[in-house]
Each structure stands twice: as C-alpha cells, then as structure tokens.
C-alpha cells in the first residue's frame, strides 16, 4: 500500500506522540465506484492531534498507518445525505471537505459510520480537530521585539482635500426648487488647517458664479411679472440688464468673497447674508428694483379697440382665403374627368384639409370678436356704475342731513 501524497507539514511534536488519541474506531471508507456499485472498505481510523491516521487493520503505532492526513488542509466536516433517499446507509455518511486554496493536494474523504450516533461523534471530534489545526497555524506566527505594528489609518500621512465649489448648473437647479423669494441655503464648509499659500481662486470663481446665477434668476422672474402687467409696446424699453449699473455704462464686475477665519470651521449662511458682505458696492440700485415699487400700469382705453380691429382684419383675411380655397375646389371638381387618378385625389384631399383648417380659424376669430364685444360692453357698464356711485352717495348724505334737521 502506498501512502497518500499529503503528509505532515513539519516534524511531529513530542506532546502529540505521547498524548492519547482523541478518537479511534472502525468506519467504512469510500474507495471509488465499480462497474455496478460503489466500493466501500473497512478502515481503522485514529484521530490524534491535528492528524488523521487510516489503516487497513488495527495498529498500536500510528507510524505504521497506510494513510496520514493533515487536518489543516481541510475546511470542514459535515454530514452527507441525499435528500430523496430512504436508505439507512445515507443517514450515517459524513465527509471531510478540503480547502479550496490553490496548491492544496489533499483529497475529499467520505466515510460511513456504524450508526447515526457514531456519525455525530466523528463529526464533532473532526470539527474540533480542524479548528485546533487552523489555530495552531496562527499561533506559530512570531513577532520580533524590534518590530512594531503600525496603525493602518492613524499613522498614515494626512492629505488636505479642498472642497470644490458648486457649479452654476447646480445653483440654478437648487434655486428653481427653492422658495418663491429665491432664498436658498448654501453650506460653506472649510477644511481644517487650510494652507496659507493656497490661492483664493476657488472663492473668486464661486462668487462670480453665484452673482451671475442670482442676477439671471431675479431678472427672469421680474421680467415675467412685468410682461403680464405691461403692454406689448413697452416691453422692449422696460427690460433692463441686471448685470449693468444704472448710473454707469460699464458692466458690473463681481467682487471676491471674504476669506473666513480658521476659527470658523463650518458655517451655514443664506444667500442674503452672503450678498450683504460686499464691501465695494454697499448700495447698488437696479432698474428692476424700481419697477417692483411701481404700481401696475392700467390698461389703455384704446387698447381694446386696437385688439378688436386686429381681430376683425384677421377674420376678414381668413374668410377671403376660405372663399378662394372653396372656389378653387369647386372648379377642380367641375373640370375633373370621371376616372380619378392618385395625384388628383391627393390634391383634392389637401384642398379639403386646407378648407377645414380655414373654417376652424374663421370660427375661432368670430368667437374672439364676440368675446371682445362682450368685454367692451362690460367695461362700459362698469364705467356707468362708477359714475353713478358718487351721485348716490351725495344723495344719501343729503337725505341723512335733512332727517337730522327734522329731528332737531
């Protein structure tokens, strides 16, 4: 009989040779598959320390065993049972699974115990031996007195990380989802122990992006409000550029942000507080701020009449086009031959579609004309009511004074 390739890793310990084995007994070992059935052979197994000795007959000295297996090459010992099998043999099988590390040559071992109780006893004993073998490898690690263990995170070099300022697109996205007055909170956090020689380029770029985004946001909102209250003829003259000063023609240049002292590690400031820290421009009035304080411009009396004239001209033009298209379609229908050709049918469909669209446009213009006429009548009615209200108030005052005189 030749011995297995997996032997001991080192010289045997004297304590292991003199100590009594943990467990001994006869079990059946799986030796392969034959032509018709599996081959199982009785073997005498001795568990001593972290070594497993297997021999064909009972021996007093473990050195005479045919096979020696080092349990440090194995990962676990567990029960081996088929789920759908009812055979008593399958209730007593257990296996030693080898480690899956590269270079391991130990084979997987399968045993069959005499009874399920004996199987549980072998599994517990082999599992404890495998654990001791793994711990023995760890206990063999020695540390010299001169060497020391460095802390992996505490002793490494510190690297200063500078925070990147928010981009312009991010500021616009945050401002669009903020409250109606445009206030948004910016988290200005400075890193600990900033280097004194670091330039203030980040702060300057942050100030430029912030001022541009705020000016564009405020201008777009106020421009929308002014478009709703001002007529179309005055929109071009009323719009002013938010980045230009009203008193000077030169464009406004944003100022750099103040550098916070090192004592302020982190600070949460609002947009209003940041803009109030500007030194060079303490008072910067804008045309847009003046437009906010002005009352809404009332509609001009002639505006409604101009709209009515425009609607009337559009209605007349639409009706002329509709009549022209209808005449063209009637002429084609009269001059058309009895057999239809595909181009004639397509042109006829195009004329019908054009006629339908012009008819819808004509009805829409007519409806707009009626609505404007009703608006004009309502405006005249409100004017008459406003004129009659002071006269009725005077009459009530005179009647009240006459009633008081009669009482006196």
Swiss-Prot record:
Its main location: membrane. One of its GO terms (cellular component) is cytoplasm. Residues 229-240, 389-401 have a biased composition (Polar residues). Residues 1-21, 217-264, 325-348, 389-408 are annotated as: Disordered. It comes from Mus musculus (Mouse). Pfam families: PH (PF00169). It is a peripheral membrane protein. This is Pleckstrin homology domain-containing family O member 1. Residues 135-307 are annotated as: Interaction with ATM, CKIP, IFP35 and NMI. The modification Phosphoserine is found at residues 226, 270, 341. Residues 132-192 are annotated as: Interaction with capping proteins (CPs). It is found in: Cell membrane; Nucleus; Cytoplasm. Plays a role in the regulation of the actin cytoskeleton through its interactions with actin capping protein (CP). May function to target CK2 to the plasma membrane thereby serving as an adapter to facilitate the phosphorylation of CP by protein kinase 2 (CK2). Appears to target ATM to the plasma membrane. Appears to also inhibit tumor cell growth by inhibiting AKT-mediated cell-survival. The record marks 309-310, 344-345 as: Cleavage. The record marks 154, 156 as: Interacts with capping protein. The keyword Phosphoprotein applies. Residues 307-408 are annotated as: Negative regulator of AP-1 activity. GO terms for biological process: lamellipodium morphogenesis; myoblast fusion; myoblast migration; regulation of cell shape. Residues 20-131 form the PH domain. C-terminal fragments could be released during apoptosis via caspase-3-dependent cleavage. Keywords: Cell membrane, Cytoplasm, Membrane, Nucleus, Phosphoprotein, Tumor suppressor. InterPro entries: PH-like_dom_sf, PH_domain, PKHO1/2.
């Amino acid at each position: 009989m030749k011995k297995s390739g997996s032997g001991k890793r080192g010289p045997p310990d004297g304590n292991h040779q003199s100590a009594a084995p943990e467990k001994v007994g006869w079990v059946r070992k799986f030796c392969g598959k034959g032509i018709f059935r599996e081959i199982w052979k009785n073997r005498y197994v001795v568990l001593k320390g972290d070594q497993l000795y297997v021999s064909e007959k009972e021996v007093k000295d473990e050195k005479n065993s045919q096979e020696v297996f080092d349990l440090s090459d194995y990962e676990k010992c567990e029960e081996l049972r088929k789920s759908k099998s009812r055979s008593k043999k399958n209730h007593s099988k257990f296996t030693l699974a080898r480690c899956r590390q590269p270079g391991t040559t130990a084979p997987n071992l399968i045993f069959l115990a005499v009874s399920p109780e004996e199987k549980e006893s072998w599994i517990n004993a082999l599992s404890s031996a495998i654990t001791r073998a793994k711990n023995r490898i760890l206990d063999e690690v020695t540390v010299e007195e001169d060497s020391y263990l460095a802390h992996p995170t505490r002793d490494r070099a510190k690297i200063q990380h500078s925070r990147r300022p928010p981009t312009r697109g991010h500021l616009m996205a945050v401002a669009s989802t903020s409250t109606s007055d445009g206030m948004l909170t910016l988290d200005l956090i400075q890193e600990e122990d900033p280097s004194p020689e670091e330039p203030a380029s980040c702060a300057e770029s942050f100030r430029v992006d912030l001022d541009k985004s705020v000016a564009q946001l405020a201008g777009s909102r106020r421009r929308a409000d002014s478009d709703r209250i001002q007529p179309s003829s005055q929109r071009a003259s009323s719009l002013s550029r938010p980045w230009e000063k009203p008193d000077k023609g030169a464009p406004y240049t944003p100022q750099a942000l103040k550098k916070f002292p090192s004592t302020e590690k982190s600070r949460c400031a609002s947009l209003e507080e940041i803009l109030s820290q500007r030194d060079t421009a303490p008072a910067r009035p804008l045309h847009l701020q003046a437009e906010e304080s002005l009352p809404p411009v009332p509609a001009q009396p002639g505006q409604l009449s101009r709209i009515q004239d425009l609607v009337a001209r559009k209605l007349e033009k639409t009706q002329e086009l509709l009549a022209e298209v209808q005449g063209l379609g009637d002429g084609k229908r009269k001059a058309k031959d009895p057999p239809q050709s595909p181009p004639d049918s397509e042109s006829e469909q195009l004329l019908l579609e054009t006629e339908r669209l012009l008819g819808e446009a004509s009805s829409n213009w007519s409806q707009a004309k009626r609505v404007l006429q009703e608006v004009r009548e309502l405006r005249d009615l409100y004017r008459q009511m406003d004129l009659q209200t002071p006269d009725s108030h005077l009459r009530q005052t005179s009647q009240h004074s006459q009633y008081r005189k009669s009482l006196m």
